[in-house]
């Protein structure tokens, strides 16, 4: 599929043209991922001629709203699976995502649009990992509150004995 976003048609980088499984028997497929879900099918695949023109985002606000939703789902899902992160890892994953999109996937060849999409990918990745970091901090803070409450209750009830 060819991706169109923000008034640009992308040929490289994070929005480079990709292949998407579209026609399949529903009883022979299962779905992977909660964000950017995709069908997985073990049947032989055939590539059809031509492209699907995919018009994804018209504006920064539209992207921001969708990114906010997807990053929350990603963080909650990964937190439930036991994944943890640090602030340094948040930045490292984001920087790697930018470099992968802009340099390894040749986003720089698309000029301004390649830089734009690569920076957006940096922000998107940072949002994912910061939300994961936030979830683990909230859980740690709750645990500390429970421990302090338990300690306080022990003190109160020991004094009454």
Predicted feature residues:
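Catalytic-site signature of metal-activated, phosphate-bearing donor transferases
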Residues: 1-139, 146-148, 156-158
């Amino acid at each position: 599929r060819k991706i169109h976003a923000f008034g640009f048609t992308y040929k490289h980088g994070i929005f480079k043209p990709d292949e998407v499984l579209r026609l399949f028997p529903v009883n022979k497929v299962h779905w992977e991922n909660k964000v950017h879900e995709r069908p997985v099918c073990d049947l032989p695949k055939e590539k059809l001629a031509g492209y699907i023109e995919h018009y994804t985002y018209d504006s920064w606000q539209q992207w921001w709203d969708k990114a906010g939703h997807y990053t929350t789902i990603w963080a909650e899902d990964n937190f439930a699976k036991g994944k943890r992160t640090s602030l340094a890892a948040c930045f490292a994953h984001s920087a790697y995502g930018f470099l992968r999109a802009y340099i390894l996937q040749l986003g720089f060849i698309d000029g301004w649009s390649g830089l734009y999409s690569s920076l957006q990918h940096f922000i998107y990745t940072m949002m994912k990992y910061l939300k994961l970091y936030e979830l683990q901090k909230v859980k740690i803070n709750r645990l500390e509150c429970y421990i302090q409450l338990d300690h306080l209750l022990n003190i109160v009830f020991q004094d009454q004995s």
